[in-house]
């Protein structure tokens, strides 16, 4: 939906004095509406079993501190949330006041007029305390539409004991070093040195390593066909066919198979995110947590390592009335405070988005401490509403490239053609 249509829906909703929030029916007019008790709805997309209990406890704490605000907490499956929110916001009915949004959704929601800017509100009062690349990622056309709640990135996870057995004392810092280490590990330790998940998100470090991305926003260009992108994917293709690198697994269970192999010591290193550290520590090779090494992804020929930044932002719905927006801003500020983020990190083993939340209690978790050290290599996503949609065509062609069904040049050309349908105003290289 275009911004103008969204605005029309919002105007209609206000005209009939009905809150667009599904949890309440308060009008935006009148002092009583702003002074009296208000109930806001929060859609939480965290894991309902392992993470939601922490958020429910924080909501209860918030309500005790703010007796005039009640929070209708709703756990919404992450896989359904983007479509569900879009449908409700487009209809002007049933959308929550606050949403835990994937960082990749924010630009699209903002472009469609579904979110309210948070600049100058209580939600953004401590903006300077957050990792600035995360603030950049939550900004669209110069306005801040989300407050970073949790973050993540990719890193090289490696088995220190296997590396030591092969006579390797440090993690590789370039793809060429990783290739050489994999061969040495296979020869001296008898297991594969590296395994790769053939997913476009996991291929991004190979683009960043050549100083490029999927798009160039400033010049409105698609980068898939650029010399740098071609070089990056050629580097990846050469790596996965090198001695000591596990055979590419493109089956439906491929992701799980890679993790099982790493956790059991059958593979020495993988590219992975912090969401898997809890599972890794349950593996037979990591009963001693200090055996897990976490390093920045290797660098490409540009000499710089780079990995995509993921995570979630808290956003506020533009269709909520003034009283509900004010209450939403308070909730967002509370949930993203240093104290709340410390609680979330210690309970859920997720990465905080602000440095003052990395307390000694938080960094006592070696997974969090390890990923904190590599966050500086994180690359914020460009502020383009269609950016996340590009992972689809990129992933489809990447599988064909890596399995030898098409050349790197042909595959990246195909990605370009498909991407131009999503970004018709972007030129190809």
For each predicted feature, which ranges?
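Glycine-centered hinge/linker elements that transmit conformational signals in sensory
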Residues: 182-183, 221-250
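Short, solvent-exposed loop/beta-turn-alpha elements that line the ligand-binding surface or hinge
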Residues: 119-130, 212-233, 282-287, 296-306, ...
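Long, aromatic- and glycine/proline-rich binding clefts that accommodate carbohydrate-like moieties
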Residues: 133-136, 292-296, 345-393, 400, ...
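Extracytoplasmic/periplasmic substrate-recognition and gating elements
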Residues: 60, 166, 238-244, 283-347
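Hinge/lid segment of periplasmic solute-binding proteins
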Residues: 103-153, 177-179, 187, 206, ...
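A structural signal for short loop-to-beta-strand junctions that line the ligand-binding cleft
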Residues: 95-97, 126-162, 192-196, 294, ...
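Conserved N-terminal structural module of periplasmic/extracytoplasmic solute-binding proteins
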Residues: 2-107, 299-302, 323-326, 410, ...
